[in-house]
A protein has these predicted regions:
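Structured segments of extracytoplasmic/periplasmic soluble domains
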Residues: 4, 10-14, 18, 43, ...
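Ligand-binding clefts/hinges and TM-proximal coupling segments of bilobed small-molecule sensing domains
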Residues: 57, 63-73, 146-218
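Extracytoplasmic/secreted envelope proteins and their assembly/folding machinery
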Residues: 27, 50, 68-75, 92, ...
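Pocket-lining segment of extracytoplasmic ligand-binding domains
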Residues: 5-7, 14-17, 46, 82-174, ...
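An extracytoplasmic/periplasmic, membrane-proximal ligand-sensing/linker region
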Residues: 94, 101, 111-129, 139-146, ...
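N-terminal targeting leader peptides, primarily classical Sec-type signal peptides for secretion
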Residues: 48, 76, 238-241
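A generic structural-conservation signal
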Residues: 2, 62, 84, 108, ...
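Short, glycine-/small- and polar/acidic-enriched structural segments
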Residues: 1-54, 59-62
């Protein structure tokens, strides 16, 4: 199945949304696919930094969702608690409409960039993308190994003239630990041997690479996937060590 790389880490460790159910180790990583970018945006030109969110109404995604925990990580790194803002638990579409209607001041979205909701708002009303960088980003990267640095290129959204610094998790494929090695090997080969063909049909396919597949993964790889990567000169962890 498909999962954010941070969410699979929560499941493996039995934390956050998986605290009640406890840790589960019955799955393995096949590989990372593309960036699920943490995007913080506003229509208010006076909100320029994460710290400027204090006292503001901010959409942080549905409670216990991947977006919610990503937003918490950013806020916490900026010294902001939920008591310091007016949190709103909205979907991407509702975040867009609430910004447009002036009901919220800023929103977090975690998805591949460009994201339709942000593109639509940038086209009709204009948006400001807020950088997640400096000490805040350094703190997050230090504490949470499933995040990596990311730069949203200039021109990704209408009116976005400068690149935006942020962080990302990855859309990841996981498989059952009991799936046989040959099947997982063939699945891995089917994706990465045909990356160019996939990219011709879907823009996110341009991010498919063996480097993206194997970096930022905190959960052990399936032996079948590991065999494929080894044939291409990449050694991955299959034991959780």
């Amino acid at each position: 199945g498909f999962v954010q790389s941070d969410v699979m880490a929560y499941a493996w460790d039995g934390v956050r949304a998986f605290e009640q159910d406890g840790a589960t180790h019955d799955f393995r990583t096949l590989g990372g696919l593309y960036a699920e970018t943490v995007q913080l945006f506003t229509m208010d030109p006076d909100i320029k930094t994460v710290e400027d969110l204090k006292g503001k109404s901010v959409s942080i995604g549905a409670a216990n969702s991947g977006v919610y925990f990503n937003a918490l990580d950013v806020l916490n790194a900026g010294g902001i608690t939920l008591d310091d803002i007016h949190p709103q638990y909205l979907s991407f579409e509702d975040s867009k409409e609430s910004l447009k209607d002036g009901k919220i001041d800023a929103a977090f979205i975690v998805a591949g960039a460009p994201t339709t909701a942000i593109t639509e708002l940038a086209t009709t009303n204009g948006v400001y993308m807020i950088n997640i960088d400096g000490a805040i980003r350094d703190s997050i990267l230090s504490d949470c190994p499933y995040y990596t640095s990311y730069q949203i290129p200039a021109g990704t959204y209408p009116g976005q003239d400068e690149p935006v610094e942020t962080i990302t998790v990855k859309a990841t494929i996981v498989v059952s630990e009991n799936l046989d090695d040959d099947t997982v090997y063939d699945m891995t080969a089917a994706i990465f041997d045909h990356a160019d063909e996939i990219a011709s049909e879907n823009a996110k396919g341009e991010e498919l690479s063996l480097e993206n597949a194997t970096t930022g993964m905190t959960i052990p790889f399936h032996e079948g996937a590991a065999r494929y990567y080894a044939e291409h000169g990449i050694t991955v962890d299959t034991k959780g060590e």
